[in-house]
Amino acid sequence: MNKWLDLILKIHVHPFLWIIAALGLLTGHMKALLCLLLIVLIHELGHAALAVFFSWRIKRVFLLPFGGTVEVEEHGNRPLKEEFAVIIAGPLQHIWLQFAAWMLAEVSVIHQHTFELFTFYNLSILFVNLLPIWPLDGGKLLFLLFSKQLPFQKAHRLNLKTSLCFCLLLGCWVLFVIPLQISAWVLFVFLAVSLFEEYRQRHYIHVRFLLERYYGKNRELEKLLPLTVKAEDKVYHVMAEFKRGCKHPIIIEKSGQKLSQLDENEVLHAYFADKRTNSSMEELLLPY
């Protein structure tokens, strides 16, 4: 029970949202604002509830004027199926919300105009969230797809590039189709800034992924995936090949012949504990 109470206490509202709420009250648009807030809140609680169920470490649930976000202390080492469930839990809330609104309209609890307004916001938020742009749900699902096929670092970089392409397409669509829609411009700017910040933090994000592997926190490895590397390969370049959901026995070859084999933890220990950041794999085999 305490973890659910803690979740409620972690809900934070952006100050700008309070300003929007005040303007909505003054201009008589409270019904639209309440519909929007309800949909956003339920959507984010869908993510958060599954995260709590899987014992993720939640920092806060942050509600913005045009959406929300669940900030977690997880760095890419949860099972892919588990993360998929947490991501998809948000969009799934829109299904029962729409059905509930339809039922209320059918029994005349809410007016038809209110139902149409709710439907517009519900579908708009759903479709926007499924755009393949980081940090939207669609962008996170795309990252999972890339992570299943590629090493974490390559998947993250490809996701940023793909998200940037779709973000630019979104910007062009806003510019040429709905240039007077302020909310669309706010969304575009938010996504552009989020992508820029994610790009700036890309090295730090990879290091956190590696650190979590090193300390073995919350890891449920699905399979062993050997990595064959050259003796002269640097430690950091080898770690750039680490994939999610896998533990890597590292086979070191020299002149086409197997020289030795290391566990990934030995490589991580050499990098983080021994600070052998510029060592080659062959040098790791020598006494330190």
UniProtKB/Swiss-Prot annotation:
Q: What is this protein called?
A: Stage IV sporulation protein FB
Instruction: Write out the transmembrane intervals.
Output: 11-30, 32-56, 84-105, 127-146, 162-178, 180-199
Q: What is its EC number?
A: 3.4.24.-
Q: Which family does it belong to?
A: Belongs to the peptidase M50B family.
Database matches in Pfam families: Peptidase_M50
Membrane side Forespore intermembrane space: residue ranges: 31, 106-126, 179
Q: What else is known?
A: Could be held inactive when BofA provides a fourth zinc ligand, preventing access to a water molecule and the sequence of pro sigma-K.
Kindly report the protein's main subcellular placement as a broad class: membrane
Entry keyword annotation includes Membrane = yes
Q: Which organism is it from?
A: Bacillus subtilis (strain 168)
Q: What does this protein do?
A: Implicated in the coupling of mother cell to forespore gene expression. Required for spore formation. Processes the pro-sigma K factor.
Query: What lineage is this protein's organism placed in?
Result: Bacteria, Bacillati, Bacillota, Bacilli, Bacillales
Documented effect of changing E44D: Partial activity
Q: How does it assemble?
A: Forms a complex with SpoIVFA and BofA localized in the mother-cell membrane surrounding the forespore.
Against InterPro entries, the record matches this protein to: Peptidase_M50
Q: Where does Zn(2+) bind?
A: H43, H47, D137
